[in-house]
Amino acid sequence: LLGSSELMGADPNDYLPALINAAERLNRGAMAVQGPPGTGKTYLASRLIKHLVEKGKRVAVGTNSHAAVENVLNDCISAGIPKEQVFKVRDKDDKSDKDWTAFSSADTLVTGLKRNPGPLVMGGTSFALCNKKVREYKFDYLIIDEAAQYSLVDLIAASGIAQNIILFGDPQQLSQVVQAVHPGGVANSALGHFIGENSILPSELGYFVELTRRMHPELTKAVSWLAYEGRLG
């Protein structure tokens, strides 16, 4: 399904064709994208979302926090998705203007979903993704950003909202923030469960983005050797 596990290029846009191809071939399945610091994970996620919406798909986006979700949605707007196709329930403590379509509650979000049966993006934390009324409006894709911080339990609970799941993140960069203890490996993060004991995501499960633009080359070499089996460039 996925082919080479390593995405290589001088620009994040070089990676998009492979990701788009793999995402379109998912059939009630899941894949992941492991991107170390500075590899453009959120950029890739937002451009993939834009392509899916242009193809008529409905995409749900989740992370642990309102701020993280809104970061992805703002990138989706920057990518060119119209505000009218980007939905989210407003954080109750946030009264600022938004570039996307903000709703005051899950009930008003449901009304918006009912009135807009076509392609769109809906962002939310686990509370929104697991809301019984919201889940009635099925999505084609569920995309989780910073999936190394997103608990496996939350992913299982939210997974019923969509036919396909795509995880973006890096367990080597940010680990799960939840400290609760559960038996049987359930305490693992969503992406940590995918990767298992490996430093690099297995090729049959997704892609490793190998080029970072954030660090000095000499520092990148050290980090690559210590955490990424020498594959980060």
Enumerate the language-model features and the residues they cover.
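Conserved helicase motor core of SF1/SF2 NTP-dependent helicases
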Residues: 54-56, 63-67, 75, 79, ...
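ASCE P-loop NTPase motor cores of helicases and related translocases
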Residues: 1-125, 231-233
